[in-house]
């Protein structure tokens, strides 16, 4: 999965915010049917990855940027380990973030000829454990207690059929990221279902 946190802003002040759709689009463009992410073993090769689910966090239309966007990428393996996949995904997310920031800065320089402001976003790409650790270091036991309570509610919602595994996963990421400083961030990871290698 990939989760992108942006910075909320009105569409009329788009350069004051960070649109997660922009970054997620770059990540999708670099991963969708990318043969470098396909796996091979002997004379077999998997089909390349494809995105199966994606949405922003808005529950209704308004004229603000979405605060976050997330999606699920299907990756088939023959020999790659989860670690192999995550390392490749981390690099793509980092490269995508750098490219989007570079493009934004160029456009912002043109815009800033008319406005005296600066853009200071930095690349921040972490796995779920990275944001969990950051939140735990910032808020300690109060975070851990709230996390356990949230996890319990998500498990109950999933068990009752009120939540899908996707909904529960992204709600948990959204919950944890709410505890860390609000800045553009990409969170990546694996989530069920995880199947054995294809044959």
PLM features: residue spans?
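Midchain, well-structured core segments that form catalytic/ion-binding scaffolds
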Residues: 1-147, 151-154
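Substrate-recognition/cap regions that form aromatic- and gly/pro-loop-enriched pockets
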Residues: 151-199
């Amino acid at each position: 999965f990939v989760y992108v946190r942006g910075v909320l802003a009105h569409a009329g002040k788009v350069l004051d915010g960070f649109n997660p759709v922009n970054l997620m689009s770059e990540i999708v463009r670099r991963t969708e049917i990318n043969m470098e992410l396909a796996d091979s073993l002997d004379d077999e090769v998997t089909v390349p990855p494809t995105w199966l689910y994606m949405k922003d966090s808005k529950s209704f239309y308004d004229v603000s940027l979405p605060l976050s966007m997330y999606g699920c990428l299907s990756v088939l393996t023959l020999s790659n380990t989860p670690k192999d996949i995550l390392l490749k995904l981390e690099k793509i997310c980092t490269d995508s973030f750098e490219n989007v920031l570079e493009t934004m800065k160029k456009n912002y320089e043109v815009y800033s000829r008319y406005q005296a402001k600066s853009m200071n976003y930095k690349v921040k790409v972490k796995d779920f454990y990275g944001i969990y650790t950051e939140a735990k270091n910032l808020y300690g036991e109060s975070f851990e207690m709230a996390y356990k309570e949230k996890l319990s509610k998500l498990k109950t919602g999933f068990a009752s059929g009120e939540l899908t595994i996707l909904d529960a996963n992204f709600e948990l990421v959204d919950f944890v990221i709410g505890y860390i400083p609000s800045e553009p961030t990409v969170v990546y990871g694996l989530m069920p279902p995880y199947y054995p290698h294809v044959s």
